[in-house]
């Protein structure tokens, strides 16, 4: 299955210019894409999410919203915490996006509940400082996720597969750890989701925990419009955003703990660059694997793995 990422469920959920956001007028173009994927014999999925505070007024057309009010240095911008009465409509936006995905010919949706985006911002004690029923205890912090999943599963019905990408760890002190994220996974299992994609990291606080390797400071700052932020990141970025060494299957140790406790299908992602390691991961009981960078490096890598037992991507 080929998954298209990332598509915002509302305009306020856009994190970059020219990003997809789900609305009726883009359905015909997406249908062309899914028709092409299906013609090649594959299934098509689309990742749906809302970036929360990871945006800017110049991108999303409004003051960015999040689990709590504050200032996000990553954007950089002030952020308005969503009111409790706004949350049901935000959850319904996820459901509407599932319906649009169906119209566009997608076979599956992947709900993005990780990496410090909106659902993740509600889940993490680092970004959720609310004093109402959506903040404080883990049970409260999961309420918005529960609301979203109710709308998603209702819209998905019996003909759309629903995967959820979630964090096993946020990747920094004060973020979510396994004791809480295992509970999140069990709640998602109860929600009726069909599979979990196990990831980790927080784009605004621990981006290289997600991707591993050295932070591409020059490439990242090239696209920054704010001159003082660009200068600051180039000067102190490598200390503010430390590198995290890359190794093959870098999330496997944590993912195996989920495999032991969670009965539903699990998808492994993170550092897969060889057929040998993919076979090893699948032998550990994961129903599927997900790749991104290896396929950007070599779009035909999956086809080559069919032919070569020792196939390895040039991606590092």
Question: Predicted regions span which residues?
Answer:
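Flavin-dependent oxidoreductase catalytic cores
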Residues: 1-316
């Amino acid at each position: 299955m080929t998954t298209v990422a990332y598509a915002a469920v509302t305009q306020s959920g856009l994190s970059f210019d020219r990003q997809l956001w789900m609305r009726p007028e883009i359905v015909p173009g997406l249908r062309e894409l899914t028709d092409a994927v299906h013609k090649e014999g594959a299934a098509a999925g689309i990742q749906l999410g809302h970036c929360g505070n990871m945006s800017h007024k110049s991108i999303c057309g409004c003051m960015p919203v999040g689990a709590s009010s504050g200032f996000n240095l990553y954007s950089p911008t002030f952020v308005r915490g969503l009111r409790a009465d706004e949350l049901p409509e935000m959850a319904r936006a996820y459901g509407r996006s599932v319906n649009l995905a169906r119209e566009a010919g997608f076979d599956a949706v992947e709900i993005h509940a990780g990496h410090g985006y909106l659902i993740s911002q509600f889940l993490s004690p680092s970004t959720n400082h609310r004093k109402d029923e959506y903040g404080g205890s883990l049970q409260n912090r999961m309420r918005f996720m529960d609301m979203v999943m109710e709308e998603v599963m209702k819209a998905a019905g019996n003909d759309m597969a629903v995967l959820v990408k979630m964090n096993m760890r946020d990747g920094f002190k004060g973020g979510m750890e396994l004791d809480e994220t295992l509970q999140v996974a069990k709640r998602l299992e109860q929600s009726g989701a069909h599979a979990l994609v196990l990831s980790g990291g927080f784009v605004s606080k621990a981006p290289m925990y997600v991707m591993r390797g050295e932070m591409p400071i020059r490439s990242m700052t090239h696209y920054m419009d704010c001159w003082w932020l660009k200068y600051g990141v180039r000067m102190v970025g490598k200390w503010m955003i430390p590198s995290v060494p890359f190794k093959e299957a870098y999330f496997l140790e944590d993912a195996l703990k989920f495999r032991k406790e969670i009965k539903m299908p699990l998808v492994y992602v993170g550092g897969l660059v060889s057929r040998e390691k993919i076979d090893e991961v699948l032998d550990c009981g994961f129903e599927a694997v997900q790749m991104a960078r290896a396929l950007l490096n070599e779009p035909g890598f999956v086809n080559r793995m069919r032919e070569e037992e020792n196939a390895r991507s040039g991606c590092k």
